[in-house]
């Protein structure tokens, strides 16, 4: 079987990579990249897995589909490439980070530092056509990322799942069917449409760190600037 991941995700997802739907999805994606402008760049699609190995995951922040503007998406949910203006949801996340932990708002909205510490930044759909939000919905990505969530929730070691907004919160059933007492943090989505309905003031970053300390795990250094 082709090596998709350079770490333990390869073994964890080996069965999934052999399933018919995944081969169909790969063909669809290959065709889209050859005929359309697709984000993120093909080499970045699996970045969430490359950057955070299965065994290293402590926290999962679930997003929806990638940013669909030029040079924004690079395979980590909510994150943008260096030098790119902060999209509104990310701007609100960084504002809450400042309010919660006093972290200065960084110039770059690149969240790789979080991912390298065990915060998996996973979108439920991993590709998108330029300028067309949700254009790769229902092509197979959801089945793949549901399997990822299921594999994470199956771990004996508890994790923290961060579910912002209704689509993310619908994944709760995948998490709760497992016996492991995972912690689920729910809040409205940080988008401008809902941030003032309870995302601001939800203090996710300090709550995550308090929980990690309770579990005798190293807290996340959230500050980016």
Swiss-Prot record:
Establish whether keyword Hydrolase is in the entry.
yes
Query: What are the UniProt keywords, alphabetically?
Result: Cytoplasm, DNA damage, DNA repair, Hydrolase
The EC number on file is 3.2.2.27
Q: Which reaction does it catalyse?
A: Hydrolyzes single-stranded DNA or mismatched double-stranded DNA and polynucleotides, releasing free uracil
Listed GO cellular component terms? cytoplasm
Tell me, what is one Gene Ontology molecular-function annotation carried by this entry?
Answer: uracil DNA N-glycosylase activity
The UniProt family comment states: Belongs to the uracil-DNA glycosylase (UDG) superfamily. UNG family.
Matching entries from PANTHER family are given as:
URACIL-DNA GLYCOSYLASE (PTHR11264:SF0)
Output this protein's name.
Answer: Uracil-DNA glycosylase
Q: What species is given as this protein's source?
A: Lysinibacillus sphaericus (strain C3-41)
Give the gene name: ung
């Amino acid at each position: 079987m082709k090596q998709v991941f350079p770490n333990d995700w390869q073994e964890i997802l080996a069965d999934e990579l052999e399933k018919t739907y995944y081969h169909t999805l790969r063909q669809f994606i290959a065709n889209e990249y050859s005929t359309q402008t697709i984000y993120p760049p093909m080499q970045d699609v699996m970045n969430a897995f490359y950057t955070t190995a299965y065994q290293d995951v402590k926290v999962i922040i679930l997003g929806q589909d990638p940013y669909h503007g030029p040079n924004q998406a690079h395979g980590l949910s909510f994150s943008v490439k260096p030098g790119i203006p902060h999209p509104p949801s990310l701007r609100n996340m960084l504002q809450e980070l400042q309010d919660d932990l006093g972290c200065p708002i960084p110039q770059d909205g690149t969240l790789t530092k979080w991912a390298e510490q065990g915060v998996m930044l996973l979108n439920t759909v991993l590709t998108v056509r330029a300028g067309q939000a949700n254009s790769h919905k229902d092509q197979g990505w959801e089945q793949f990322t549901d399997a990822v969530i299921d594999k994470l929730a199956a771990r004996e070691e508890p994790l923290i799942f961060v579910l912002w907004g209704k689509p993310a919160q619908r994944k709760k059933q995948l998490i709760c069917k497992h016996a492991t007492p995972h912690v689920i943090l729910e809040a409205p989505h940080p988008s401008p449409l809902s941030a003032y309905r309870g995302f601001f003031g939800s203090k996710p970053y300090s709550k995550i760190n308090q929980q990690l300390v309770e579990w005798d795990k190293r807290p996340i250094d959230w500050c980016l600037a």
